[in-house]
């Protein structure tokens, strides 16, 4: 039976179910604002004005009590400790969700303990329930702070490369038995070296750890970051749940992870050569991380040939039963060795970034994706070219995201890579199922990007998309793809895009050469009884329309100067969409 109690507030009796606060009712709609509660609590109400409050009224009451210790005949003393604790808990939860700055949510309990001695006692009797913690930065006087508060868990946060106050961080780290969270962000040498030296002892209470090293020139690969020694954290992290290393070399990381069996989030990014560890060592530690939900593993640059020897398959299967998000950046050979023994039955987001290779051979990646239960045939695909890479995203293949990106600059390399990944790096049932294909670029694409690309290379890259009905071309790619379509018209018009029905062009005012090229392709498809309709595509307004709602201007093939195509001798009866 749930425990109930009754307490009096200015003549208004409320009955609250402590063990089921969601069952509290209010016979008044809409819910009064906190300002209204302030007025109500200051005067008597008729007995028939029974008001039963939803859960967050507790927060409103607490806010009123924080405004003043007494309001009329209402004081904090009328509330039992259990009710105060419920309100404190909810108040701190709301503070955590609404705080704009990280320390504010950690230190919200300071407000409560300064109201009165009774509130202070209630708060400090339940430090675990209220998740009380002390927050230290380089500007926090550690000794004075520790002297005035109970022995609560410690959070250490250092952001930036300020030289002042480093002694405070080091002094806080020396309380290793109480430190529950450490974030050292954008810290340069030798300050990071000094902090790492202090962290060689065990931190038994540590649940979150983030270290990001900041070099002097972020555009250049730098191998001067201090190497984390094998004795880091005493070689054990039994309570660690969140680990984030960015640009920090730690070759002994897999050994530490063997003890971190409660790990939920693992982010290891921008690994320099000095921090390399083998895929086999990574598989060994991953096999113990059965609670892992998010895994990021990324290398700063291609792995030297020294580490690219052929490897035997890992003898033990590794199942990550809770993993939902995997992101990788590195060599394709490394990923192949890593994924071969791994299964992730709940995976719903997969992002892969490869450094360029002439031949990209990824059979293990194909098998890994194929045995992922959440995988399904996508409806659309996005091919995006940038100054540094080409990527293919299949939004509907997984509940989250499926992305494969090749990191390279020359446009010819990008086209060759696109052809390879679309034909061999995805399971065979994915790319051929795509019905809507978007080809676009980013703002940093160089103007001379396509100078060395032949039409045959474009045809090879687009050939796997056999089911595409709708082709969307961004402004920059309209002229680039147009000549390829023109070549199709002169040879085998259905060799590529045999199912194509609609072309959406973001560029509205086409040059005569581009109009002729697209027009020849449209006319050639008309001759084989596979008509193509050309539309203007406003990518900014795309979300405002469903496919069936896109406006089309009649069947006239000859429009004014604002039309996408205006050559009646080429277009025949194809429809054109106006702006």
Model regions and ranges:
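Leucine-rich repeat
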Residues: 1-579
């Amino acid at each position: 039976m749930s425990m109930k109690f009754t307490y009096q507030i200015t003549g208004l009796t409320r009955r609250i179910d402590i063990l089921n606060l969601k069952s509290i009712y209010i016979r008044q709609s809409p819910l009064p604002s906190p300002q209204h509660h302030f007025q109500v609590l200051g005067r008597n109400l008729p007995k028939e004005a029974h008001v039963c409050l939803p859960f967050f009224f507790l927060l409103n009451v607490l806010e009123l009590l924080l405004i003043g210790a007494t309001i009329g005949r209402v004081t904090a003393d009328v509330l039992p400790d259990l009710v105060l604790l419920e309100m404190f808990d909810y108040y701190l939860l709301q503070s955590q969700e609404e705080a704009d700055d990280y320390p504010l949510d950690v230190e919200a309990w300071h407000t409560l303990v300064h109201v009165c001695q009774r509130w202070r006692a209630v708060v400090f009797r339940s430090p675990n329930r209220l998740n009380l913690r002390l927050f230290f930065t380089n500007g926090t006087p550690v000794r004075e702070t520790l002297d005035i508060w109970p022995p609560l868990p410690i959070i250490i946060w250092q952001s930036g490369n300020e030289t002042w106050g480093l002694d405070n961080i080091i002094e806080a780290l020396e309380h290793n038995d109480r430190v529950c969270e450490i974030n050292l962000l954008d810290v340069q040498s030798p300050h990071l070296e000094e902090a790492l030296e202090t962290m060689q002892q065990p931190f038994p209470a540590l649940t979150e750890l983030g270290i990001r090293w900041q070099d002097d020139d972020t555009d250049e690969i730098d191998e001067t970051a201090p190497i984390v020694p094998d004795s880091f954290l005493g070689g054990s992290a039994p309570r660690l749940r969140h680990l984030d290393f960015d640009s920090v070399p730690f070759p002994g990381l897999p050994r530490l992870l063997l003890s971190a069996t409660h790990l939920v989030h693992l982010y290891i990014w921008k690994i320099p050569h000095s921090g390399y560890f083998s895929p086999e060592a990574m598989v060994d530690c991953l096999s113990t991380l059965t609670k892992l939900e998010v895994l990021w593993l990324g290398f700063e640059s291609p792995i030297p040939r020294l580490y690219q020897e052929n490897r035997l398959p890992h003898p033990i299967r590794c199942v990550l039963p809770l993993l939902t998000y995997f992101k990788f950046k590195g060599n394709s050979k490394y990923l192949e060795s890593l994924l071969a023994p791994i299964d992730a039955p709940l995976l719903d987001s997969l992002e892969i970034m490869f450094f360029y290779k002439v031949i990209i051979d990824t059979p293990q990646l194909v098998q890994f994706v194929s045995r992922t239960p959440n995988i399904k045939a996508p409806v659309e695909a996005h091919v995006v070219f940038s100054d540094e890479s080409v990527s293919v995203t299949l939004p509907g293949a997984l509940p989250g995201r499926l992305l494969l990106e090749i990191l390279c600059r020359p446009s010819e390399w990008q086209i060759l890579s696109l052809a390879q990944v679309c034909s061999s790096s995805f399971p065979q049932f994915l790319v051929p199922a795509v019905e809507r294909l978007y080809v676009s670029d980013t703002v940093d694409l160089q103007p001379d990007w396509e100078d060395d690309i032949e039409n045959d290379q474009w045809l090879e890259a687009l050939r796997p998309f056999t089911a595409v009905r709708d082709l969307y071309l961004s402004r920059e790619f309209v002229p680039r793809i147009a000549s390829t379509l023109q070549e199709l018209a002169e040879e085998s018009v259905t060799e590529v895009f045999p199912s194509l029905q609609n072309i959406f062009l973001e560029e509205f005012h086409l040059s005569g050469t581009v109009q002729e090229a697209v027009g020849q392709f449209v006319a050639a498809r008309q001759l084989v009884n596979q008509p193509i309709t050309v539309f203007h595509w406003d990518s900014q307004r795309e979300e405002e329309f469903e496919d069936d709602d896109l406006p089309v201007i009649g069947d006239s093939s000859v429009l004014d100067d604002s039309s996408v195509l205006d050559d009646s001798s080429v277009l025949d009866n194809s429809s054109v969409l106006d702006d």
